[in-house]
Amino acid sequence: MSPAPSPAAPERVAQNTAGPTPGAATATGAPGQPAPTDNIALCDKPGGMGLSRIVEIDTTGGPGFGFEHFKQYDFLRDKEVVLTFDDGPWPENTPAVLKALADNCLKATFFEIGEHATWHPEIAKQVAAAGHTIASHTWSRKDLAKNPYASDIEQAKQEIEMGISALHAAVAGPISSFFRFPALQHPPALLSYLAERNIATFSTDIDSFDFKMHKPEQVIDSVMRKLEKHGKGIILMHDFQRATAQALPELLHQFKDGGYKVVHVVSRSPVTTLSKYDEMLAQQDKLSVNNSRPLSSVVHTIGQPDH
């Protein structure tokens, strides 16, 4: 049985209603940091799911979420899920994920890699413009539990903070005070550092392991089997993966048929960047001239003779 939330758990919730009510908040959030309203309009997309709730999280002191690692806060009701996507933004796949979500009037949390956002800022902006939550997944997705980061906390902090600065620059505005560690490895010293920064750490309840899969059917089967077992949860997928992007429309359809509901999580306050790392990012941009992109994302064969 999941423990009951303590008083410090998320408190402000927006419900799915048919329309606005007197005094309802109407302000929209800054890019990457949506502001919850007092209600959620019904989905106007044919067959779309629509959001069930928006949950605002007070990240003071760096709470942890996701029962795979953190047991204290259980804010989801039966058959509720939070959709999270790691490792974007990425061409083709991230836009396909965005379309599937838009077709269902849903919002998700994107834990983006800072370096990827510098390569594809236009896609990061699309994620923010659609009202999704943007959060950091480090600068270059290094496992911070391994050396050199495990033995050099300053280098590990740089990997965290450069990711935050890069996302902030890519979307030209604030992002949420959420963070997910690469490989879900949580060094205690870095958890303490995030707590000092008032950044919440997200693990998962349902890990799709979609990075091991090449077919959309495999992704769907993995998620649904685990969801049926647990009944609810924070779901980890990757918008970097083509199979996931291809699977999402059918997966959302199965969610709806199964009576599952999607919750959008937002942070009460955006994360602030640190000037030291903003300056490091600016200096790196001047020196790198984007030469760090992988060959496959730069050079494409578009024609060759038949043999």
Regions found by a protein language model. Name each.
Residues 1-41, 285-307:
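Compositionally biased, proline/threonine/alanine/serine-rich low-complexity intrinsically disordered stretches
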Residues 72-75, 118, 244-307:
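C-terminal domain-boundary segment and adjacent tail
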Residues 107, 133, 200, 207, ...:
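Residue-level detector of anion-binding/catalytic polar loops
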